[in-house]
Amino acid sequence: MGATGSSQLEKEISTTESVNNANEHYYGLVNFGNTCYCNSVIQALFFCRPFREKVLNYKQTLKKSGASKDNLVTCLADLFHSIASQKRRVGTIAPKRFITKLKKENELFDNYMQQDAHEFFNYLINTISETLIQEKIAEREKASRHGTLKKGNVTVNLAPATAGLPRSDEKGTSERNGGITVEGNEFLNKSDTTTWIHEIFQGILTNETRCLSCETVSSKDEDFLDLSIDVEQNTSISHCLRVFSETETLCGDQKYFCETCSSKQEAQKRMRIKKPPQLLALHLKRFKFVEPLNRHTKLSYRVVFPLELRLFNVSDDAEYGDRMYDLVATVVHCGATPNRGHYITLVKSNSFWLVFDDDIVEKLEVSSMEEFSGMSTDANIQMPPGNQSAPQKNSESAYILFYQARDYAADDPNHNHKGKNSTHSV
């Protein structure tokens, strides 16, 4: 971003910004060759204030302890601190150290090809969580060298940040989202395997199954750090979440084995939210394999996303069942395929929105948000008869949405939910 552009944006921001938000910084990130997938997620997480504060606190804690570490978390913390401590409010910064560390840690990202922003998001939060857990293990080992907790032979089984894998309450199995097994089949306390990643992003789904013969209802809980939901043409986030929790009938070869009946029976099952997370990360499944093309392509369906969201697909015993969410950031994919295109980020800073396009930062009118919902007709997968290699139209479509719980932001002076934003219920 040039000096003229930076000063102009700074003037625009100063005229609309509240006093509480006067110390916020808006810095574009340099693209090191198709690293927009990384830049877009970093910008989104930077403006998820609970996440940013935890990252900055991590750096401060290390500084106080005098410890010197070189991992992906410290690289991210240094980047966040560098942005937050700049003298100018607006500018550009190069995340070179973070990108270098990322490529060194994971060969998937060690190239100049376009990567999937959602895969990077999953990798980042799981890596942070695993690092924090390992640090807790090291601290406990150091504090209990003469205790019952033995040193060495420690295995960290960190679950992926997606819904759908079972929680295990049985001793001897790895627990969901960070079960720790130590020598002698001993388990660390749950507090040792719960990190601030879980505190911020983790929710609980409950899979309810009702036998249609005896009416017995069984349930199974599953932790999640984000939700991946299917998309349909000309719909909304509310509709997609309703479909996610639709009742499914199990019959024929899919019959359910009922413990009460001791036999396979027809049943109905549905997935509902038992514990809504503090920060809800929604991933729209926009990429699918198309057989005529023999490759993955993009579903540029128009899916309207609200600025305010209330979840109603919750279980009867749900914690915070009436929780209201505010949209704080959106990662947008521009292009026709997973491996081609570009990522940008829309973020909310107090009373206004901005768009981050690598090193370019611009204000965004709320009225323009709908332009990033996708296309009303999906030109990407429609092909003229006899022509399977027709040109594909690009589109700007919301890909990852970050909704922050309003009660979670109650003490955040920079979070303002006043205004005439649309509210959609699920």
Swiss-Prot record:
It is found in: Perikaryon; Cytoplasm. Residues 162-181 are annotated as: Disordered. SUPFAM superfamilies: Cysteine proteinases. One of its GO terms (cellular component) is nucleus. This is Ubiquitin carboxyl-terminal hydrolase 46. Expressed in a number of tissues including the nervous system, pharynx, body wall muscle, vulva muscle and intestine and is detected in many head and ventral cord neurons. It holds the Pfam family UCH. CDD domains: Peptidase_C19G. Disruption phenotype: Decreased levels of glr-1 in the ventral nerve cord and corresponding defects in glr-1-dependent behaviors including reduced spontaneous reversal frequency and reduced responsiveness to the nose touch assay which normally induces backward locomotion. Increased levels of ubiquitinated glr-1. It comes from Caenorhabditis elegans. Residues 27-406 form the USP domain. Regulates the abundance of the glr-1 glutamate receptor in the ventral nerve cord by promoting its deubiquitination and preventing its degradation in the lysosome. Contributes to the regulation of embryonic polarity. Gene3D superfamilies: Cysteine proteinases. A lipid is attached at residue 2 (N-myristoyl glycine). One of its GO terms (molecular function) is ionotropic glutamate receptor binding. PANTHER family: RE52890P (PTHR24006:SF733), UBIQUITIN CARBOXYL-TERMINAL HYDROLASE (PTHR24006).
